[in-house]
């Protein structure tokens, strides 16, 4: 059967459900697909709860993660939605960036309020750079009708405070209360399907369209460098974001002092191009740059858009023995290699105060100092390796210097 063509006419957004276990994340995911299929139609298909719950395990950077991917659309947008069955899957998913989220729907049970994983997921969202959160207060049908408004208001205030604490704008965040179960059962009431439409309306209006990857400033990690006699030095790699045109000025950033050059030629598959864009594997001919002035692990970037750093804080997941990770814990001042984009750089781990060691399977916030600076900004993913094998995965949460 011929595959259906992906419709690019609508803006696309990656979204996911986050929140405490049993607060109704998976039920809400099923309710969204079901409600949109019934009331909006189009290409929307209702996906049953157990189809989402029996999420297939997939490997991302060697780590096994169970995630379910659904798609749906509103009149304005196309959404790819990720839902994880287990808490550990969420942690791994957010840190490895297996499913990059442009926004998250935080599901909170109106009967319980904030629980430990509610906080943990908000913190993770902040650390890994999820830019927007919309809140769905679920299970509102379980509250007595005469107390419902007061209880919902109370939970709302509590969640607002939590969002503010982790630098999300709690007072601007949309809150929708309802019952994902009632919506899933097809009940067309304020708590049922109408609450789902309200939720999607809030996501449509509150979350802006993400910047397309080609509209971001040019960046290309250098994979290889060679010189062509009589022409100069060529740096090869895959364009990560943005567009590169001939005669563009670029900076070479990372490992050494930042230098500038001009791109005098762009080649792809031995053909000359006028420009290259995100996703292209290219060779860029650099004017006046010697082969020994540039190396793998640096990046070519639009001037002034990225800076090199050695010290940063990171959110890290340490692989278990079964995932091919370490069999034993590691301690403060552990010195592994950090694999950024195309190269390994040695660095030192400083564990948070009071923490003696990190066990395989742990998720931890740590400070890292590299021996050479690397071009980085918040949200950059990396692997932690020992002798070439991956023992952890991390994301830059904050740059220190």
From Swiss-Prot:
GO cellular component entries: cytosol
Binding site for Mg(2+): 26
tr-type G domain segment(s): 10-211
Top EC group: hydrolase
Region spans: G3: 83-86
MF annotations from Gene Ontology: GTP binding; GTPase activity; translation elongation factor activity
Cellular compartments annotated: Cytoplasm
UniProt keywords, alphabetically: Cytoplasm, Elongation factor, GTP-binding, Hydrolase, Magnesium, Metal-binding, Nucleotide-binding, Protein biosynthesis
Residues covered by region (G4): 138-141
Record: residues binding GTP: 19-26, 83-87, 138-141
Metal-binding recorded as keyword: yes
Main localization of the protein described in the UniProt heading: cytoplasm
Span list, region G2: 62-66
Catalytic activity: GTP + H2O = GDP + phosphate + H(+)
Family: Belongs to the TRAFAC class translation factor GTPase superfamily. Classic translation factor GTPase family. EF-Tu/EF-1A subfamily.
Subunit structure: Monomer.
Free-text function comment from the UniProt entry: GTP hydrolase that promotes the GTP-dependent binding of aminoacyl-tRNA to the A-site of ribosomes during protein biosynthesis.
Protein name per the record: Elongation factor Tu
Species in which this protein is naturally found: Leptospira biflexa serovar Patoc (strain Patoc 1 / ATCC 23582 / Paris)
